[in-house]
From Swiss-Prot:
Organism: Homo sapiens (Human)
Family indicated by similarity: Belongs to the band 7/mec-2 family. Flotillin subfamily.
UniProt-listed GO biological process terms: anterograde dendritic transport; cell adhesion; epidermis development; negative regulation of amyloid precursor protein catabolic process; negative regulation of gene expression; positive regulation of canonical NF-kappaB signal transduction; positive regulation of establishment of T cell polarity; protein localization to plasma membrane
Protein name (database record): Flotillin-2
Tissue: In skin, expressed in epidermis and epidermal appendages but not in dermis. Expressed in all layers of the epidermis except the basal layer. In hair follicles, expressed in the suprabasal layer but not the basal layer. Also expressed in melanoma and carcinoma cell lines, fibroblasts and foreskin melanocytes.
Length: 428
């Protein structure tokens, strides 16, 4: 098993080792690589720009003047596979500071050697050429280390014996002298030239004034001619414009009339269409619904009529059936009552006095209830008699009057019934 290692574009990943003593090396930057456990080794080296500041102090030039020179260099490890392999071979495992020290010492050595071949003026006055020369000389050496010089510039040049300042003062004095001479000659030439220019200016001015006057006179004459011609053309154009305007107005009016006629025809057609639409709308919204409503009402009336007829027929049939049923009931009741009366009569004839006695006994409770009805309102009855035999005689008197009362109420003569006769002791 192993691990997947990733690396950004500012670093290079070096994977070495492998199975069976393999010496294959893989260089990756801005990507990923696979490394086996225990048998593969992974290391990283920076590809970022390194800023160096080489400094050479008191280095004698070709003229023997001691100068101190400082510069700024931008270097980085190259990413070409062969050069990256060279750089990894020499710097892998070292930190950035160690790499910078190696390159810095190389640049300072070349800078010292080049200073010894140039004069102070060449170094001071043409710094770009001096820096270019350093780059060209140092580039092959650092290139063999896998390092690329991106830029190299001279930062400062100075000395401790004021050679540069003296050189500057001398040059400044020469320049100042030449400047004063140049100013005097320029002022002299300027005065002469100014006078000549004034003379030429006056000559030119006089000639110009003459030409201006001639041109002005010719201009006024030409202007008058042009004005007259313009007025004529203007009048003709105005007349032609008015005539053309009148013709155009006539055409416009004619077209307006034609447009009005067409619009009126279209309006008439639209009104006719509107009348047809309104008629159809009235038919659809008023007439058809009214006809439908009338038809619906007619159907409802006919249905109601049929309903009432059927209801009347049903009611008549109902009344007839009820009448027939009631008549049948009355007839059955009459027949039953007649049969009952017939059976009673036969029973009375068959059983004689016993039947009559049963009839009397059946009627007696009703009679007693009618007789006793007034007594229900009496709280108590007090019999006043000084003799016990008097009470007995009163009871016998009431019993003796009972047959007459029954005969009056029912038409039955109890005195003719032997059992009652014996009980009451009535003599016929």
């Amino acid at each position: 098993m192993g691990n997947c290692h990733t690396v950004g574009p500012n670093e290079a990943l070096v994977v070495s080792g492998g199975c069976c003593g393999s010496d294959y090396k893989q260089y990756v930057f801005g990507g990923w690589a696979w490394a086996w456990w225990c048998i593969s080794d992974t290391q990283r080296i920076s590809l970022e720009i390194m800023t160096l500041q080489p400094r050479c102090e008191d280095v004698e030039t070709a003229e023997g003047v001691a100068l101190t020179v400082t510069g700024v260099a931008q270097v980085k490890i190259m990413t070409e596979k062969e050069l990256l392999a060279v750089a990894c071979e020499q710097f892998l495992g070292k930190n950035v500071q160690d790499i910078k020290n190696v390159v810095l010492q190389t640049l300072e050595g070349h800078l010292r050697s080049i200073l010894g071949t140039l004069t102070v003026e060449q170094i001071y006055q043409d710094r770009d050429q001096f820096a270019k020369l350093v780059r060209e000389v140092a580039a092959p050496d650092v290139g063999r280390m896998g390092i690329e010089i991106l830029s190299f510039t001279i930062k400062d040049v100075y000395d401790k014996v004021d050679y540069l300042s003296s050189l500057g003062k001398t040059q400044t004095a020469v320049v100042q002298r030449d400047a004063d001479i140049g100013v005097a000659e320029a002022e002299r030439d300027a005065g002469i030239r100014e006078a000549e220019c004034k003379k030429e200016m006056l000559d030119v001015k006089f000639m110009a004034d003459t030409k201006i006057a001639d041109s002005k006179r010719a201009f006024e004459l030409q202007k008058s001619a042009f004005s007259e011609e313009v007025n004529i053309k203007t009048a003709e154009a105005q007349l032609a414009y008015e005539l053309q305007g009148a013709r155009e107005q006539q055409k416009i009016r004619q077209e307006e009339i034609e447009i009005e006629v067409v619009q009126r025809k279209k309006q008439i057609a639209v009104e006719a269409q509107e009348i047809l639409r309104t008629d159809k709308e009235l038919i659809a919204t008023v007439r058809r619904p009214a006809e439908a409503e009338a038809h619906r009402i007619q159907q409802i009336a006919e249905g109601e009529k049929v309903k009432q007829v059927l209801l009347a027929q049903a009611e008549a049939e109902k009344i007839r059936k009820i009448g027939e049923a009631e008549a049948a009931v009355i007839e059955a009741m009459g027949k039953a009552e007649a049969e009952r009366m017939k059976l009673k009569a036969e029973a009375y004839q068959k059983y004689g006095d016993a039947a009559k006695m049963a009839l009397v006994l059946e009627a007696l409770p009703q009679i007693a209830a009618k007789i006793a009805a007034p007594l229900t309102k009496v709280d108590e009855i007090v019999v006043l008699s000084g003799d016990n035999s008097k009470v007995t005689s009163e009871v016998n008197r009431l019993l003796a009057e009972l047959p007459a009362s029954v005969h009056a109420l029912t038409g039955v003569d109890l005195s003719k019934i032997p059992l009652i006769k014996k009980a009451t002791g009535v003599q016929v």
